[in-house]
């Protein structure tokens, strides 16, 4: 066997369909070269690595600070609570805090994340520094002048960014990505966001059926963050965000965790919450926790020819070996402690 070649056997969840198959996966120089079926037997589970489709990890420096008042008083730029805290935090403390959070995501099998990075060019550079040398890579969506040195722009809302048209024009001219918060507290900014044909919408918690139909028709993915929506008080019902309606209309949903100050960026917890509160089927939930990887250009699904980005989960040391439905067990019970190996392309 080539020194750059590795063969991993397990019950793998193959392709976007997450078809459960006992296989031997041959990885050579970071690429999945061959997936070969083998005889069924007791095997570890092999799953795609996860992608956190929406974060604000810098505000983790204010982790679990008491949050009172309306959402806009907490997170809206430029004078919301989180922005005041970020401005007052020394740069090295921000970098150290972000690196700790990225390391926590890495330990949980999260290979990448899309972060709305405040603070202009220095903010983008701080996140790049924080992620240096780690295998959990950011898609950085900058603000306040940081858009063109990042992977693109992360817009707080189409209704509260002065000169948004000019920002979008610059981003598009540079061939960068455009992501916009929309419909988090009401549907009033969704239509305006859609006029910019974004590459990603975040939240859509209160988007109307007509708006969701338009989003589906345009093929724009939606990063939903239900735990954050509940914590910030913009929902108290399984009807919001309207996950079932999104799926029925053909929307492509991704899963994010939003503000680290309020929510641990752990997609295992997010998946379990969605399963419990919204009752979606396990395959839909797990697929949404991986699909955001398309933002990197190389999705993490397990297919021949793609970069190898997958997790080996051993159910044997815990009671997970009792599972009659491994995919449901992954969504509702698994976590970082069950991961015994990560196969990650460089």
Question: What are the roles of these predicted feature ranges?
Answer:
Residues 187-301, 313-318, 333-335:
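Active-site-adjacent C-terminal substructures of enzyme catalytic domains
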Residues 10-11, 25, 30, 43, ...:
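Divalent metal-coordination and catalytic microenvironments
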Residues 44, 55-83, 99-113, 124-141:
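Catalytic pocket of metal/acid-base enzymes, prominently hydrolases
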Residues 291, 304-346:
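C-terminal cap of metal-dependent C-N hydrolases
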Residues 49-51, 178-179, 253-255:
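Residue-level marker for buried hydrophobic side chains located in beta-strands
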Residues 84, 88-89, 95-97, 114-199:
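Metal-coordinating catalytic core of metallo-dependent amide/deamination hydrolases
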Residues 60-96, 191-196, 216-222, 274-280:
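Active-site gating loops and adjacent loop-to-helix segments of metal-dependent hydrolytic enzymes
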């Amino acid at each position: 066997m080539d020194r750059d070649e590795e063969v991993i056997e397990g019950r793998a969840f193959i392709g976007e369909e997450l078809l459960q198959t006992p296989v031997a996966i041959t990885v050579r120089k970071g690429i999945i070269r061959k997936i070969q079926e083998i005889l069924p037997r007791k095997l570890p589970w092999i799953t795609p690595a996860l992608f956190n489709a929406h974060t604000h990890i810098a505000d983790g420096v204010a982790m679990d600070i008491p949050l009172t008042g309306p959402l806009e008083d907490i997170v809206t730029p430029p004078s919301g609570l989180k922005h005041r805290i970020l401005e007052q935090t020394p740069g090295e403390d921000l970098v150290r805090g972000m690196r700790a959070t990225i390391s926590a995501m890495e330990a949980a099998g999260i290979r990448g994340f899309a972060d709305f990075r405040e603070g202009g060019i220095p903010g983008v550079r701080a996140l790049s520094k924080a992620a240096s040398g780690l295998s959990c890579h950011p898609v950085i969506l900058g603000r306040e002048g940081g858009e063109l040195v990042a992977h693109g722009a992360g817009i707080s809302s189409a209704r509260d960014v002065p000169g948004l048209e000019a920002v979008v024009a610059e981003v598009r001219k540079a061939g960068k990505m455009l992501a916009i918060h929309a419909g988090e507290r009401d549907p009033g900014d969704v239509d305006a966001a859609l006029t910019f044909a974004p590459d990603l919408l975040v939240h859509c918690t209160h988007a109307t059926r007509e708006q969701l139909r338009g989003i589906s028709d345009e093929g724009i993915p939606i990063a939903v963050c239900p735990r954050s929506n509940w914590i910030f008080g913009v929902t108290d019902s399984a009807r919001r965000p309207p996950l079932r309606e999104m799926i029925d209309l053909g929307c492509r949903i991704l899963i994010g965790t939003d503000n680290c100050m309020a929510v641990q960026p752990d997609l295992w917890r997010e998946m379990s919450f969605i399963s419990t509160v919204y009752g979606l089927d396990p395959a839909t939930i797990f697929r949404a926790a991986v699909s955001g990887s398309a933002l990197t250009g190389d999705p993490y699904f397990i297919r021949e020819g793609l970069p190898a980005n997958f997790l080996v989960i051993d159910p044997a040391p815990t009671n997970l070996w009792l599972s009659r439905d491994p995919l449901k067990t992954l969504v509702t019970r698994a976590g970082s402690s069950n991961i015994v190996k990560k196969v990650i392309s460089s």
